[in-house]
Amino acid sequence: PSCILIVSGTQHGLRLCIDALLAPGDAVWFEDPGYFASRHTLRATGVTLVPVPVDGEGIVVTAGEKADAAAKAAYVTPSHQFPTGVAMSMARRIALLDWARRAGAYIFEDDYDSEYRFAGPPLTALAGIGAERVIYLGTFAKTLFAGLRLGYLVVPPALVARVVAARAAQDRFPPVFMQDALADLMADGVISAHMRRMRPRYRQARDVVADALARYAGDSLHLAAPAQGLHLLATLPHGAPKGAAKLIRERADIECRLLSDARIVQRGPDGFILGYSGFATHDLTGAARRLGRAAQEILSQAGRAR
C-alpha cells in the first residue's frame, strides 16, 4: 500500500512521473500508433518522443533500440494497445523489461482497458514481472465513469519519495471523500459485481459492431475485434486514396477518431477507432451500417475514377 499513490487520472499520474523522473529533452519511446492524450501530455513536458512501431505482439522493441537504445523511458499500453487492440505477448514483455534494465530506463505501463477482458485469463502486468523498472498507471474512468477523476500509480519503492514530492508541488491529492466513497464500493463488492455485469454487455456490443461492419462493408474495411476493451479498429485496405477515411466518416455521419490521428509517422492505410460503450444496440447497428455502406461507396467511386 505504501507504493500506491492516488491521482486524478492517468494523465495526471503520467505527468507526475515525467516531472519526478525525467528532464526536458529526454527521449521516451512511444507506441506508434498510440494514445493521443498521452502523446499530448508527454509533449507538454518537453520530453522527446521516439515513435516505435507496433505489430501483432505489441511494441517492437528491436525497432525502439534501433531508433534510440539509450532512451530514458517507454510509454506502453500492453493489455490492450491503443488503438490496434493488440495484447503484448509475454516474449515482447520480457524483451521490453530486458531493455529497460540494460538502459536504466523506466517503463510507464498504462493498463488501458485491462478490466474488460472477454476471454481467457487476466494478462500478467509488466509491473508484476519487473516491478523495479515499471510505474503502473491505472484509472477508474472506464470501470465507473470519467468524471470521477480518480486513478492510481503503483511506484517502485525506491521512487516513491520522488513522485510524492512532485505531487506535493502540484495538487497534493484528489478529494478524500471521493476516495472514501470508492473504497466503500470496493470493500462491499459493488465494483466487482458491476464488472461482472458489464463484461458480457460490452462483449455483445463489440460483436454487434463487428457483425454489422462485416455485413455492410465487405472487403472495404478490415476488422480487428480484440478480446478486451471498449473499442475496435476498422482499417481501410492498402491502396485506399488519401483522405478517403475523412470522406467516409463524413458521409456515414458518425463521430469517431481516425487511425491517422493516433499516428506520429503516417504510414499504412487509415482507419476508424470505433468505441462501442454507452450506446443502444440499434444505434450501434445503424452507425456500423452507415459506415460500411459509406466505405463501399467511396472506395468504389475512387476505383472508377482511376
Locate predicted features.
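A generic "structured core" feature
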Residues: 20-22, 40, 95-96, 107-108, ...
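Short glycine-rich anion-binding loops that position phosphate/pyrophosphate groups of nucleotides
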Residues: 78-82, 142, 279
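Conserved PLP-binding active-site segment of the aspartate aminotransferase-like
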Residues: 155, 233-239, 255-296
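PLP-dependent aminotransferase class I/II
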Residues: 135-215, 222-224
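Conserved core of the PLP fold type I
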Residues: 1-103, 115-129, 133-135, 202, ...
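Conserved glycine-rich beta-strand-loop-beta hairpin in the small C-terminal domain of fold type I
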Residues: 200-210, 221-235, 242-248
